[in-house]
From Swiss-Prot:
HAMAP family on file: Ribosomal_uS17_B (MF_01345_B)
Family affiliation: Belongs to the universal ribosomal protein uS17 family.
Function: One of the primary rRNA binding proteins, it binds specifically to the 5'-end of 16S ribosomal RNA.
Gene from which this protein is expressed: rpsQ
SUPFAM superfamilies xref list: Nucleic acid-binding proteins
Key words of the record: Ribonucleoprotein, Ribosomal protein, RNA-binding, rRNA-binding
Name used for this protein in its record: Small ribosomal subunit protein uS17
Organism of derivation: Fusobacterium nucleatum subsp. nucleatum (strain ATCC 25586 / DSM 15643 / BCRC 10681 / CIP 101130 / JCM 8532 / KCTC 2640 / LMG 13131 / VPI 4355)
Key word Ribonucleoprotein present: yes
Amino acid sequence: MRNERKVREGIVVSDKMQKTIVVAIETMILHPIYKKRVKRTTKFKAHDEENVAQVGDKVKIMETRRLSKDKNWRLVEIIEKAR
């Protein structure tokens, strides 16, 4: 069951909350009429138990049970640290 959970990669845009980070995930979609590729950004709140992620880090997050009103993702790993 654990392998069927959604996994996403994105950039940390906020770490101001305790044990929570905001991760921005960019996806490219094709505009239905103009057929131009358009960048769409979605923000997810993710649980960061040890407060290790910082703004600018590239991270991997995984879907999990509901942790609060807006939070049902958790930090799996930090792929690349910010400079």
